[in-house]
Amino acid sequence: MTIRLEQPTDYREVENLTRESFWNVYRPGCTEHFVLHHYRTSPDFIPALDLVMEEDGRVMGHVMFSKAELLADGGRRVPSWTFGPISIHPDYKRQGYGLRLLQYALQKARQMGVGFICMEGNIEFYKHAGFGLASKLHIHYHAEPEDAVVPYFLAQELIPGWLHHNGVTEATYCPPRGYFVADQNPEAFEAYEATFPKKEKAFQEGQLPQFCQSCGMPLTRVADCGTNADGSTSFDYCQYCYKDGHFLQDCTMDQMIMHCAQFVSEVNKGLPQPITREEYIGQMKMFFPHLKRWRQEQ
């Protein structure tokens, strides 16, 4: 097993590897391969930390790193870093290769002066590489309330004392825009996806919660979903917002929020403690700007 820098001749193989690794894991289908495809030309991309793992001449693992930012007190922007996607071919998963690749990459990043990393992932895996809840370091996730303990938002000081040395006692992490390229360019993503062999999207146990990217309704089964122009299932939007490739409501984000507010009594049925209509509106005003439909308007 060897680890080396990715070369241009590896690009398509690595993108296919990434697609195979992530398909239906965190959501129906995946977009990580498209993120990688575009990221290599981003100013945030770090070529020296773009690594592949080989076994007998076959590329079976890959990880890339990116520049990022923390928004600290007074709006001060502090450079930081993140990584991902990290991919291991399904044939090699659960054999320790992912951890070996990540530990190698983190050591190389540390040697390059990378001092602090935020990322999103499963703590049960990433704790073995030194990651813990970012909230314990008073680093907040941009899409969650500041007092929330976000179980998938993780961080690590690769260089001890880096936060203190940079005057960071509390900050908010904003993921680089390059990670949202599929949402911002849905037609380009669909055209790119069509260059790969067709695979079926599906809801599976263990995926992250999925929400309608227009109204925020939870999506847990195909029957909840809308339809695309060709009649296929849209895993992005619910049946009440999207049909045959068109939105059923011609409205602004604020109008959608007020429309959804009338259903607060239904929302409260699934909550341990009920919230008021005003509280629900406040939560939606924080959440909706991060939904695909409305993020395109930001």
Regions found by a protein language model. Name each.
Residues C225-F235:
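Short linker/helix segments within small regulatory modules
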Residues E15, F22-M64, E69:
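Active-site rim helix/loop that mediates acceptor-substrate recognition in acyltransferases
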Residues Q111-V114, G121-D147:
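Conserved active-site alpha-helix within GNAT-family acetyltransferase domains
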Residues T2-V14:
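A short beta-loop-alpha structural element at the N-terminal edge
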Residues C212-C215, C238:
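Short cysteine-rich clusters marking metal-coordination/redox-active sites
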Residues P85-K93:
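A short, internal acetyl-CoA/4′-phosphopantetheine-binding micro-motif in the GNAT/acyltransferase core
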Residues Y92, G96-Y104, V114:
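Conserved acetyl-CoA pyrophosphate-binding loop and the N-cap/start of the following alpha-helix
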Residues H140-E190:
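C-terminal "cap" of GNAT-fold acetyltransferases
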